[in-house]
């Protein structure tokens, strides 16, 4: 269904874009997050937004598209769920 979850709670369900389905985009988002969660769930850095892209440290997590939440909404949601 393309839902990316953090600690069992929905983080994002990416919208489909012309070049990729929402499910495909969710695999990329999950892969970008895996870098942090493979180390465990403690001390995950906060997300921030640069030029409309959600980052954790220097890792781009997601570039929102039409139909997605805004980058700031996603960063805020991530920061609530990351703990």
Predicted segment positions?
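N-terminal targeting peptides and non-cytosolic leader segments immediately upstream
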Residues: 1-83
């Amino acid at each position: 269904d393309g839902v990316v979850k953090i600690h069992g709670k929905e983080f994002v369900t990416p919208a489909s874009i012309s070049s990729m389905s929402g499910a495909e985009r969710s695999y990329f988002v999950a892969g970008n997050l895996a870098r942090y969660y493979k180390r465990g769930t403690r001390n995950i850095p906060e997300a921030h937004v640069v030029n409309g892209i959600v980052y954790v440290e220097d890792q781009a997590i997601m570039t929102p598209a039409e139909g997605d939440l805004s980058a700031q909404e996603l960063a805020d949601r991530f920061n609530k769920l990351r703990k």
